[in-house]
Amino acid sequence: MRRYPICLWLTVLGSIIAVLSVFLTPCFVVRAQGERVVMVEARAGLPFSIHFIHSVQKTPVLENLEINDEKDGFNLLSTKYQSFGVGLPFLAEEGDFREEGDYYIFNHMDRYFRTLSLA
């Protein structure tokens, strides 16, 4: 029977662990029209922003979120928008609200979402 050196076994074991870690690492994936456009490692507190045109108000909205790995979802941290209306936050108890130029800004919102659908 042939004996293999320990360094060969360690190399094989290391390669297996590296491959498994790629497949077992949680990822944050963004898809547009069924195509994957972004995929990054999903780590706690990973910040990201979503910029879109509000469907009712037809004005720009910027939302700042982070990954919440304890609850397996997302926290909405702040939002910035140009007009008041349906679907936009306005209650003072929901965060720190201020007007800045043409924009309304809500900070420290800490709203939790299990999933995000941008359709």
Located regions from the model:
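An exposed acidic His-Trp-rich patch
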Residues: G73-A119
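Positively charged n-region of N-terminal signal peptides that target proteins for export
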Residues: M1-I6
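N-terminal secretory signal peptides
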Residues: A32-Y81
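Intrinsically disordered, low-complexity boundary segments flanking structured domains
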Residues: I16-A18, R36-V38, E63-N64, F90-E94
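Hydrophobic membrane-insertion alpha-helices, especially the h-region
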Residues: C7-T25
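Intrinsically disordered, low-complexity segments enriched in polar/charged residues with Gly/Pro
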Residues: S15-I17, H51-H54, Q82-F84, L116
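A short beta-strand micro-motif
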Residues: P26-A32
